[in-house]
Amino acid sequence: MTNIRKTHPLLKIINSSFVDLPAPSSLSSWWNFGSLLGVCLGVQILTGLFLAMHYTSDTATAFNSVTHICRDVNYGWLLRYLLANGASMFFICLYLHVGRGLYYGSYMYSETWNIGILLLFAVMATAFMGYVLPWGQMSFWGATVITNLLSAIPYIETDLVQWIWGGFSVDKATLTRFFAFHFLLPFIVTALVMVHLLFLHETGSNNPTGIPSDPDMIPFHPYYTIKDILGFLMMLTALATLVLFSPYLLGDPDNYIPANPLITPPHIKPEWYFLFAYAILRSIPNKLGGVLALVMSILILAIVPTLHMSKQRSMMFRPLSQCLFWLLVAVLFTLTWIGGQPVEHPYIIIGQTASILYFLIILFLMPMISLVENYLLKW
């Protein structure tokens, strides 16, 4: 008799995705981050759902409702800081996941890669809107500054910004719609994740060598399920440590001051995971140019498959490309640091240099080094 997991209409979908899925035998721990992102998404949806039961999206009561959650709701403080720090964990896993894709050439599966870029944009939008909800100083001014960037779009600028605000400034209408979208987007992200997995399972996973592994496959369960569970435990331990010992570590002190349109904070900045893009935005003196650079800093990932010039898929056997890749990582760390600094000398010039390097490495140096490596292979 055939096992029910192979015949039942629902169970066979789960079986072919997580149990009998053929997986390359050489996958390293860098392949754990996809499943870790799934756990992060689950934690975010659950904690967010319970917080939404107590939160009020009104400018008069939003800040107080968050205080009420932390003080009066059973384990409300835990839910709030799991959500806030869970977002940081989400982005750590997300950036490592994208970095893995760049290093090992996973972007050659173009459908999976493009859905991944869509997912990145959706998660960034969700996080931005979530940061506005506590209605602290940085929430209000962050929303004002970022939504104002749309005024750089010619001809429709004023109409577009006021349409998004729902009025002539960031106010009650803005907060209400941001809450509605913040609640909705994680479910759209979940749907996109399913499409992401659908396309991935069409082609099968890449592996560290970048060489087709069809002759050497192993079942996903028990080998990679056990490996994933170890990853879950490590990540959840790190998250619990952060939440229980230093929940305020990654937040901004200004966001514990209620929003006041009459007082501007000394340094308006987003959460740490957006600082690299914020630094690129600020490095260009022109408003429209800055907005285009900001969008391109993420959208550039979409043209990475086109720029792949190497005869090898992975960087595993390409030492010159490896050096460039780690230089790119160093540039991203530099941009993240600069994004949190005030706009003054020497931070301005460092930010501009790092921004130029970021685009230069991806657009020119990587393809050129790949061609050099191709030539050296012949030699």
Swiss-Prot record:
Molecular function (Gene Ontology), one example: ubiquinol-cytochrome-c reductase activity
Binding-site positions, heme b b566: 97, 196
Listed SUPFAM superfamilies: a domain/subunit of cytochrome bc1 complex (Ubiquinol-cytochrome c reductase), Transmembrane di-heme cytochromes
Transmembrane parts of this sequence: 33-53, 77-98, 113-133, 178-198, 226-246, 288-308, 320-340, 347-367
Domain of life of the source: Eukaryota
Binding locations of a ubiquinone: 201
Bridged cysteine pairs (disulfide): none
Membrane topology: Multi-pass membrane protein
KW Electron transport (keyword) present: yes
UniProt keyword Electron transport, yes or no: yes
Keywords assigned: Electron transport, Heme, Iron, Membrane, Metal-binding, Mitochondrion, Mitochondrion inner membrane, Respiratory chain, Transmembrane, Transmembrane helix, Transport, Ubiquinone
GO terms, biological process: mitochondrial electron transport, ubiquinol to cytochrome c
Cofactors named for this entry: heme b
Cofactor descriptive note: Binds 2 heme b groups non-covalently.
Main location: mitochondrion
Positions that bind heme b b562: 182
Compartments reported by the entry: Mitochondrion inner membrane
GO cellular component, one term: mitochondrial inner membrane
Other noteworthy facts: Heme 1 (or BL or b562) is low-potential and absorbs at about 562 nm, and heme 2 (or BH or b566) is high-potential and absorbs at about 566 nm.
Family per similarity comment: Belongs to the cytochrome b family.
Quaternary structure annotation from Swiss-Prot or TrEMBL: The cytochrome bc1 complex contains 11 subunits: 3 respiratory subunits (MT-CYB, CYC1 and UQCRFS1), 2 core proteins (UQCRC1 and UQCRC2) and 6 low-molecular weight proteins (UQCRH/QCR6, UQCRB/QCR7, UQCRQ/QCR8, UQCR10/QCR9, UQCR11/QCR10 and a cleavage product of UQCRFS1). This cytochrome bc1 complex then forms a dimer.
Biological role stated in the UniProt entry: Component of the ubiquinol-cytochrome c reductase complex (complex III or cytochrome b-c1 complex) that is part of the mitochondrial respiratory chain. The b-c1 complex mediates electron transfer from ubiquinol to cytochrome c. Contributes to the generation of a proton gradient across the mitochondrial membrane that is then used for ATP synthesis.
Name by which UniProt lists this protein: Cytochrome b
Gene source species: Artibeus inopinatus
Organism lineage string: Eukaryota, Metazoa, Chordata, Craniata, Vertebrata
